Regions:
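Hydrophobic faces of well-ordered beta-strands that scaffold small-molecule active sites
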Residues: 22-28, 53-55, 77-81, 99-101, ...
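Active-site mouth loops of central-metabolism enzymes
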Residues: 19-37, 56, 75-83, 139-152, ...
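Glycine-enriched alpha-helix->loop->beta-strand junction motifs that scaffold or abut catalytic
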Residues: 73-75, 92-99, 120-123, 190-196, ...
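N-terminal amphipathic alpha-helix/helix-capping segment at the start of soluble metabolic enzymes
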Residues: 1-27, 120, 283
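Catalytic alpha/beta core domains of metabolic enzymes, predominantly
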Residues: 131, 139-285
């Protein structure tokens, strides 16, 4: 299944759906009212590769801050709204490029209608978000527990509320911390709607556990052609979310750009600090936009052969190492110059 015929939705100056590239999202963890701190974090996220950013808007002060934040950043700004419809309206009036709501907790139909009216007037897309943790009691009872079917029915019910108000500039997100339930729900929802989907595993956990859950869940979903935007939700620095999202997309062949670093797991032949060297290489190449593979190998015995699928690599040895290109040894390099030699080669890559 490849959902290249999903509805096209414009978010600020970005476009999703209709076969457009999958965009990477994150969410700030600053107080939105603190414009300086929020902008500072968003600019870091932009530099890491974030393409859409969401901020919580729990107060009118936070809604007002959106205007100044919007002026100082370069990616679409999404307002995350819970419970109070007035926050959604205020956020849109202050420049939000999209709002995220759950019509089920905004209040009466009149309140939802008031939000939709402003969105319609300004042509601002609404992301309808449903989480398994807040599934309605009647759906839990209907399906004898929290299930993929219940999550999908809840989401489509909420979408129907907005459609009945004459608006269809929508994105849907359905999330669960149960990875396989989340996958099943997306498979089911993708068969029932052409709206673009924002995909993520909610409450995934810390950097280690969250990355594993997100890689498995997002990998299974995206590999089926499902998903138009993604977020890797981690308990930690949001910049780590962007790094992980980029790697997931690149691993699936859905995104090019950025150096892929591969390294051997080390063995008794290793005579250098390969773990430290591999980490240094990963850090060193973050600002280099080449679309190539770099190998970091632990010894000169198997290093060249194992690195032949990489475009370039280094293999460590006691006192000296090797510079390798496509599995062929190019030259020997003093151990303390391996990193600098590799960086110089990368910076001059493609030059005659």
């Amino acid at each position: 299944m490849h959902r290249d015929n999903t509805k096209i939705v414009k978010i600020g100056d970005r476009v999703i759906g209709g076969g457009n590239p999958i965009l990477i999202q994150s969410m700030t963890n600053t107080k939105t009212e603190d414009v300086e701190a929020t902008v500072r974090q968003i600019l870091r996220l932009e530099q890491a590769g974030c393409e859409i950013i969401r901020c919580t808007v729990p107060t009118l002060e936070a809604a007002a801050a959106m205007k100044e934040i919007r002026k100082q950043i370069h990616i679409p700004l999404v307002a995350d709204i819970h419970f109070d419809y007035k926050m959604a309206i205020a956020a849109m009036e202050n420049g939000a490029d999209k709002i995220r709501i759950n019509p089920g907790n905004i209040g009466s139909r009149d309140k939802v209608a008031a939000v939709v009216a402003v969105a319609k007037e300004r042509n601002i897309p609404i992301r309808v978000g449903v989480n398994s943790g807040s599934l309605e009691k009647e759906l839990v009872e209907k399906y004898h527990g929290v299930t993929a079917q219940g999550i999908v029915e809840s989401a489509l019910d909420k979408v129907g509320i907005i459609e009945d108000l004459g608006y269809d500039n929508l994105v849907i997100s359905i999330k669960s911390s149960d990875v396989m339930m989340c996958v099943a729900a997306h498979e089911l929802l993708a068969q029932k709607t052409q709206y673009p989907l924002h995909v993520g595993i909610t409450e995934a956990g810390t950097v280690t556990s969250g990355n594993i859950k997100s890689a498995i869940g997002l990998g299974l979903i995206l590999h089926q052609g499902i998903g138009d935007t993604i977020r890797v939700s981690l308990t930690g620095d949001p910049v780590e979310e962007i790094k992980s999202a980029r790697l997931i997309l690149r691993t699936l062949g859905l995104r090019k750009g950025g150096i892929e670093v591969v390294s051997c797991p080390t063995c008794g032949r290793t005579r250098i600090d390969l773990i430290g060297l591999a980490n240094q290489v990963e850090k060193m190449v973050e600002d280099i936009s080449l679309d190539i593979k770099v190998a970091v190998m632990g010894c000169a015995v198997n290093g060249p052969g194992e690195a032949k699928e990489a475009d370039i690599g280094i293999a460590g040895g006691l006192g000296e190492g090797l510079l390798i290109k496509k599995g062929e040894i190019v030259k020997k390099v003093p151990e303390d110059q391996l990193l600098a030699t590799l960086r110089e080669e990368l910076l001059n890559w493609g030059q005659a």
